[in-house]
């Protein structure tokens, strides 16, 4: 996802990650420092172990383009209010990615209600196959550069799946 979204990043643009997240939702965004992105860390409150909206308001800027945040922290166990976070970020046209890998085993995420632009988690965390699942708003997905074979260029939705589908694992979901 970070590779596809880098088209929205110019040198000096900011990406916010949190210190509540799993490394899998931090490293891909940090790699965009190679193209000039500035990574800002939204730190949780040491007393409450929660991300504070007021702290987010203080670090958002006109240069912020992406906010990657966990729905439920595997580090401190708090559940973040993605609806409030998304509403605040969207006021500044910031793309919001919710990492649901630690939330999905405990509840069904309603991505429409959460207001996120993308939501990801690993199906094996919900006793499924070792596959990743990603929800994305179609109006953004359709604008992403091809992540698949070059001959599929421009043929959405095939352009957003790097490689082919894993049929044997997909059938296990039925």
Please state what every model-predicted region is.
Residues 1-174:
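Pyridoxal 5′-phosphate
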């Amino acid at each position: 996802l970070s590779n596809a979204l880098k088209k929205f990043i110019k040198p000096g643009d900011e990406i916010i990650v949190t210190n509540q997240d799993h490394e899998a939702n931090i490293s891909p965004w940090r790699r965009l420092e190679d193209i000039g992105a500035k990574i800002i860390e939204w730190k949780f409150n040491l007393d409450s172990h929660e991300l504070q909206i007021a702290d987010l308001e203080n670090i958002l800027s006109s240069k912020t383009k992406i906010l990657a945040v966990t729905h439920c922290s595997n580090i401190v166990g708090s559940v973040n209010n993605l609806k409030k976070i998304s509403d605040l970020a969207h006021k500044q046209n910031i793309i919001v990615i919710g990492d649901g890998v630690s939330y999905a085993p405990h509840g069904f995420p309603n991505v429409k209600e959460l207001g996120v632009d993308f939501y990801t988690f690993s199906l094996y965390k919900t006793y499924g196959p070792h596959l990743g699942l990603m929800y994305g708003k179609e109006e953004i997905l359709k604008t992403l550069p091809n992540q698949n074979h070059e001959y599929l260029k421009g043929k959405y939705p095939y352009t957003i799946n790097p490689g082919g589908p894993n049929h044997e694992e997909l059938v296990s979901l039925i």
